[in-house]
């Protein structure tokens, strides 16, 4: 067991709750103590949902452990079915209740209820939230479609051409507490509609158990989020011969590849409009003169597997960034992320320790961090621009406006989210560079704060050398920065200043210098630049 201040994923029953809350006509009975009801806040506070999750907690207390907790479970199951009248029922237990081993799923199935019951066995001490969501979605669909799959195993499915209709697909994987899932679905619906493809079912987001019964009617499945839907897509492919897409349409090139793959799966002729990326401004900017400022920018990427892989491709192939670090907290996606890291000549960071990620960011010295809510905090402490690309996220990353990540418009949103922090960083550096110019007016307002130039100057000096711990030479004597050295260091762009300071101090120790002045800084620059 590990004690931590912050975690990237919750226990697997949170994933099950995400599936239940994303759907309609589905209820989740969770065997859990009163303290585990905190999960409601994730949906009402972060997702800003107008109603509570469809979850009934048994909320047992310490005094209940001396009696028959099984009867407590059955009572709550019966009350939930009578009150909410769901089309299907999920039954599971939280990490705490798992220790009691009441097996609430078996109890529910023995009650003779006249609705489908899906018993969830989610190992809380070896698996995490995304796995729990994936397993819940898989078990729910398998339980509902099992009889249909047995009946249709020998029946050949007619193609959409034979039936004389437009092809139709399922969009699988979007859920609540996913990163921009609501807007991604709208964008993909729009793109597919423009390409003559209809939507059969969107699940789990907005679907009901009766909608899931129509999944086999699709000609193909679109796997939007592999962490959630890949295992389900594999099962549908085995049992109903329904192919599914492997490319996630995040980025201009990925969207083009996605459409080409889907056209091929559906047996459609590839349209010339697929290669037409004029609907996104990202390719245009990448060809413009202004984009030269972005070329070669060092970027560190961390988050869930799907968004990390997409971000690495966009950064490397579409914006001309240099990826200097890549990693994920998703153990299920570790193999794919490692393969992508190898192609970039890197070693992937697979961890759920945010402090380890922060240390890796320090070592890589990037100019931009693409990560989760936690990397935003880490980057702020390190003075590095950051854009959030993945869950876990805070409420500010669930905008009320239309802000997808997928498709053509998603590429525009990504362009804005990634480039603006770098442009604001350039502005801050220019203000600092020309601060001592006689034409510079120090009192003007800027985006850096209501105190104008004075705030920025104070910020620059306070984040300079004085607050950093003294570095000791091998002989045990400290290395001091002179005022001249500090002045020269302040002229260096803030996004590489930390690396320059470390290299200069390393050079000073090797050269036996006790003080670092402007000349030492220039000597160090020449030494490491050679």
From Swiss-Prot:
Associated pathway: Porphyrin-containing compound metabolism; chlorophyll biosynthesis (light-independent)
Q: Which UniProt keywords apply?
A: 4Fe-4S, ATP-binding, Chlorophyll biosynthesis, Iron, Iron-sulfur, Metal-binding, Nucleotide-binding, Oxidoreductase, Photosynthesis
Per the record, where are the segments of Polar residues compositional bias? 458-473
The superkingdom of the source organism is Bacteria
Residue numbers spanned by region Disordered: 448-483
Keyword Metal-binding found: yes
- Give the positions the UniProt entry annotates as the active site: 290 (proton donor)
For molecular function, the Gene Ontology terms on record are: 4 iron, 4 sulfur cluster binding; ATP binding; metal ion binding; oxidoreductase activity, acting on iron-sulfur proteins as donors; oxidoreductase activity, acting on the CH-CH group of donors, iron-sulfur protein as acceptor
Catalytic activity as recorded in UniProt: chlorophyllide a + oxidized 2[4Fe-4S]-[ferredoxin] + 2 ADP + 2 phosphate = protochlorophyllide a + reduced 2[4Fe-4S]-[ferredoxin] + 2 ATP + 2 H2O
Give the UniProt record's GO annotations in the biological process aspect: light-independent chlorophyll biosynthetic process; photosynthesis, dark reaction
Instruction: Name the enzyme's class.
Output: oxidoreductase
Cofactor remark from the record: Binds 1 [4Fe-4S] cluster per heterodimer. The cluster is bound at the heterodimer interface by residues from both subunits.
User: Which co-factors does it depend on?
Assistant: [4Fe-4S] cluster
EC number(s) per UniProt? 1.3.7.7
Q: How does it assemble?
A: Protochlorophyllide reductase is composed of three subunits; ChlL, ChlN and ChlB. Forms a heterotetramer of two ChlB and two ChlN subunits.
User: What family does the entry list?
Assistant: Belongs to the ChlB/BchB/BchZ family.
What name goes with this protein? Light-independent protochlorophyllide reductase subunit B
Can you name the source organism?
Prochlorococcus marinus (strain SARG / CCMP1375 / SS120)
